[in-house]
C-alpha cells in the first residue's frame, strides 16, 4: 500500500517545481528500497539528523491559516507536509518523532503507522508555500508568500543582529548607529595622547592620561599630568616646602614663595642651629687611631667628621660657615626685593585686565538695543538651595536699551517655601543702573518692559511665560540712580510658580533663560500693537 502511494506521488510530481520533484523522487526511492525489509530495519537506517529537524512554520498568516493546513502535533503550519494511509497530514519531523517516541500508530486515530508508509503531500506543500505571511521582525510591515520569507529575512532591515563588539542584539537599521555612537566597546581616541581604547575604558584613561591637562591644587596652574610632579617639587610657588635648615632642627613649613622671607627673618636662629649641630657632632666623634684613618680630605665637614681637627680648625670652620650665611643673606635680600617688584607689576597687570574686562562688558551691554537674554546656569543648584530654605537672589549683568539708552539689570528671587502669600514663586524685577548716557536722557524712565521666561522645548510652537508692565515715573525705581545700581526695583513678586516651571521645558541643560525687552517712550507702541496688555505689577526693594 505504501509503495502504491509513493509511485502515485512520483508520477504526479513531474509538473511541479524541481525541488518538489526531487523530494518526491527521493521519498519514493526510499520507500522502494525499504519495501523488502522490516519496519524495524527501516527505522535504523534513517539518519539521526531527522530527529533534529524543526517543527512547523511559526509565522503569522494573512489571512489566518486554515485548520486543514495545521499539524495536529505542533499546531503550526505544515512544514514538509506528509500524509498517512489514514488520510491525516503532519509535519515530516513531527510524525517521525511521534512514531519513534510514542509507537507505531497515528496520533489522531491510533491506526497502525510505520515510517515507510508516509508519503510527501506535495499539493499541501505547494498550497502552504503560496500563503501570505507577515514578516515576524518587530517594526517590519512587509508581507510576502511563505516561500519568500527566508530570502526577505536575510535582507530585512528590522532583523536582529548581534553587535560585533558588545554582542547585544539590535535591528539592522539601528546597528550602525549603535556601533558608531552608542556601543560601550566602540573604539575612541584620547584627545590628549591619541591612544585608542574602548569607550567604556575612556573615563579611567582620562583620570591617568599623562598628557591630559590638570590643575595644580596649590597655584591653579594648568599643566599636563606628567609635568606635575616636577612642578610640585621645583616650581610651584604656593606648594608647601620644608625649611632649607630642616636637617639642623628647623621644623617650619611654608609656601615656596615665602621661603626666602623665612630664611631672611630667621638667619640668626638658623646659624645657632648649625653651630649646635656641628658642636654636637664634634663631641660625638671619638679620636681615631692613626693607622685606621681614611685618606685626608681638606673640606671643613670631612675634617670635623674625621675626629682629628684641632680647636683652631673648628673655629675656622665656623667662621667660614658664618661668612657663607652672610653672603646667602645678601642674596636673599636681593631676591626678596626683586620678588616684591614683580608682585607690584603683576598686581598692576591684574588691575589693567579687570579694567579691560569691565570695558568689554560695557561695550557688549550697549549692543543689546533693548533686548537682553539672561542665561542662568546651575539653576538646579539654586532650586536645591530654595528647597533647603536658603535665600536665593541673583542679579543679571547690566544692559542698555539702546545707544544711547538707559542701563538696566534684572533681579531674580526664589521665594522660600515659608514665605507668606508668595511661597515657592519666582519673583522678577528690573532695576535702573548708572550708565554712560544718563546725563543725556530724560528722567524718570518711561516705557514698557516685557519679561519672559523662555520655553526651551523643541516643539514648533513654544509656550513662553511672559508679562508686560508699564513704567510708573512717580516711583523711585525709575528715577535716575545715584549709586551704581538703584536699590529699588519694579516687577512681579509672583511672576511664576515653581510648579509651573517644572511642567514644561523651561530648564534645559541646567540653564534657565530669562528675556527682557524694553521699549522707551519713543517706541513703546510696538508692544501694544502685538495685542499684549500689561497686568498689575509689584514694586520691590
Curated annotation (Swiss-Prot):
Entry's localization field: Cytoplasm; Cytoplasm, Cell cortex; Nucleus; Lipid droplet
Glycyl lysine isopeptide (Lys-Gly) (interchain with G-Cter in ubiquitin) cross-link site: 125, 338
Main location: cytoplasm
Gene Ontology MF annotations: histone deacetylase binding; identical protein binding; protein kinase B binding; signaling adaptor activity; tumor necrosis factor receptor binding; ubiquitin conjugating enzyme binding; ubiquitin protein ligase activity; ubiquitin-protein transferase activity
UniProt zinc finger (RING-type) residues: 71-110
GO biological process, one term: neural tube closure
Residues in cross-link Glycyl lysine isopeptide (Lys-Gly) (interchain with G-Cter in SUMO): 125, 143, 472
Coiled coil (residue ranges): 312-367
Segments of this protein annotated with the region Interaction with TAX1BP1: 1-373
Keywords, ordered alphabetically: Coiled coil, Cytoplasm, DNA damage, Immunity, Isopeptide bond, Lipid droplet, Metal-binding, Nucleus, Osteopetrosis, Repeat, Transferase, Ubl conjugation, Ubl conjugation pathway, Zinc, Zinc-finger
Annotated spans, Interaction with TANK: 374-541
MATH domain span: 369-518
One Gene Ontology term, aspect cellular component: CD40 receptor complex
Pathway, per record: Protein modification; protein ubiquitination
Pfam families with a match to the protein in the record: TRAF-mep_MATH, TRAF6_Z2, zf-C3HC4_2, zf-TRAF
EC number per UniProt: 2.3.2.27
Subunit note: Homotrimer. Homooligomer. N-terminal region is dimeric while C-terminal region is trimeric; maybe providing a mode of oligomerization. Upon IL1B treatment, forms a complex with PELI1, IRAK1, IRAK4 and MYD88; this complex recruits MAP3K7/TAK1, TAB1 and TAB2 to mediate NF-kappa-B activation. Direct binding of SMAD6 to PELI1 prevents the complex formation and hence negatively regulates IL1R-TLR signaling and eventually NF-kappa-B-mediated gene expression. Binds to TNFRSF5/CD40 and TNFRSF11A/RANK.
Function statement: E3 ubiquitin ligase that, together with UBE2N and UBE2V1, mediates the synthesis of 'Lys-63'-linked-polyubiquitin chains conjugated to proteins, such as ECSIT, IKBKG, IRAK1, AKT1 and AKT2. Also mediates ubiquitination of free/unanchored polyubiquitin chain that leads to MAP3K7 activation. Leads to the activation of NF-kappa-B and JUN. Seems to also play a role in dendritic cells (DCs) maturation and/or activation. Represses c-Myb-mediated transactivation, in B-lymphocytes.
Domain remark from Swiss-Prot or TrEMBL: The coiled coil domain mediates homo- and hetero-oligomerization. The MATH/TRAF domain binds to receptor cytoplasmic domains.
Protein name as annotated: TNF receptor-associated factor 6
Natural source organism: Sus scrofa (Pig)
Gene: TRAF6
Amino acid at each position: 500500500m505504501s509503495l502504491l502511494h509513493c509511485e502515485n506521488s512520483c508520477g504526479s510530481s513531474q509538473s511541479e517545481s524541481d525541488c518538489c520533484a526531487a523530494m518526491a523522487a527521493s521519498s519514493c526511492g526510499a520507500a522502494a528500497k525499504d519495501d523488502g525489509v522490516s519496519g524495524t530495519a527501516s527505522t535504523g537506517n534513517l539518519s539521526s539528523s531527522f530527529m533534529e529537524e524543526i517543527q512547523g512554520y511559526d509565522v503569522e498568516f494573512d489571512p489566518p491559516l486554515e485548520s486543514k493546513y495545521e499539524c495536529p502535533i505542533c499546531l503550526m503550519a505544515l512544514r514538509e507536509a506528509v500524509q498517512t494511509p489514514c488520510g491525516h497530514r503532519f509535519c515530516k519531523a513531527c510524525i517521525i518523532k511521534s512514531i519513534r517516541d510514542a509507537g507505531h500508530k497515528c496520533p489522531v486515530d491510533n491506526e497502525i503507522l510505520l515510517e515507510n508508509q508516509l508519503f510527501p503531500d506535495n499539493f499541501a506543500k505547494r498550497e502552504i508555500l503560496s500563503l501570505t505571511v507577515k514578516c515576524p521582525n518587530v517594526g517590519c510591515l512587509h508581507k510576502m508568500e511563505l516561500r519568500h520569507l527566508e530570502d526577505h529575512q536575510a535582507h530585512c532591515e528590522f532583523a536582529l543582529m548581534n553587535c560585533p563588539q558588545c554582542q547585544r542584539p539590535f535591528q539592522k537599521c539601528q546597528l550602525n548607529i549603535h556601533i558608531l555612537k552608542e556601543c560601550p566597546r566602540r573604539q575612541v581616541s584620547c584627545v590628549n595622547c591619541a591612544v585608542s581604547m574602548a569607550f567604556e575604558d575612556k573615563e579611567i584613561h582620562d583620570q591617568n592620561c599623562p598628557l591630559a591637562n590638570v590643575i595644580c591644587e596649590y597655584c591653579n596652574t594648568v599643566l599636563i599630568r606628567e609635568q606635575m610632579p616636577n612642578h610640585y617639587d621645583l616650581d610651584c610657588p604656593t606648594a608647601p616646602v620644608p625649611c632649607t635648615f630642616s636637617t639642623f632642627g628647623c621644623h617650619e613649613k611654608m609656601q615656596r614663595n615665602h621661603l626666602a622671607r623665612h630664611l631672611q627673618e630667621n638667619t640668626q636662629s638658623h646659624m645657632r642651629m648649625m653651630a649646635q649641630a656641628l658642636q654636637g657632632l664634634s663631641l660625638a666623634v671619638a679620636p681615631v687611631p692613626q693607622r685606621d684613618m681614611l685618606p685626608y680630605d681638606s673640606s671643613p665637614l670631612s675634617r670635623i667628621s674625621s675626629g682629628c681637627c684641632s680647636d683652631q680648625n673648628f673655629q675656622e670652620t665656623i667662621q667660614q660657615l658664618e661668612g657663607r650665611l652672610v653672603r646667602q643673606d645678601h642674596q636673599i635680600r636681593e631676591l626678596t626685593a626683586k620678588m616684591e617688584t614683580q608682585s607690584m607689576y603683576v598686581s598692576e597687570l591684574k588691575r589693567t585686565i579687570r579694567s579691560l574686562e569691565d570695558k568689554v562688558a560695557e561695550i557688549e551691554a550697549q549692543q543689546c538695543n533693548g533686548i537682553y537674554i539672561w542665561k542662568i546656569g546651575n539653576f538646579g543648584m539654586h532650586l536645591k538651595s530654595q528647597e533647603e530654605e536658603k535665600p536665593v537672589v541673583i542679579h543679571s549683568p547690566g544692559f542698555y536699551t539702546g545707544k544711547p539708552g538707559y542701563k538696566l539689570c534684572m533681579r531674580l528671587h526664589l521665594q522660600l517655601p515659608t514665605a507668606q502669600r508668595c511661597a515657592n514663586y519666582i519673583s522678577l524685577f528690573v532695576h535702573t543702573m548708572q550708565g554712560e548716557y544718563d546725563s543725556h536722557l530724560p528722567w524718570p524712565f518711561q516705557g514698557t518692559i516685557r519679561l519672559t521666561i523662555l520655553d526651551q522645548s523643541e516643539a514648533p510652537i513654544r509656550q513662553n511665560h511672559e508679562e508686560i508692565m508699564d513704567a510708573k515715573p512717580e516711583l523711585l525705581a525709575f528715577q535716575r540712580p545715584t549709586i551704581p545700581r538703584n536699590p529699588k526695583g519694579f516687577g512681579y513678586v509672583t511672576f511664576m510658580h515653581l510648579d509651573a516651571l517644572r511642567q514644561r521645558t523651561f530648564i534645559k541643560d541646567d540653564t534657565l533663560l530669562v528675556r527682557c525687552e524694553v521699549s522707551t517712550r519713543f517706541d513703546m507702541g510696538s508692544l501694544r500693537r502685538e495685542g499684549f496688555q500689561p497686568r498689575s505689577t509689584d514694586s520691590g526693594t
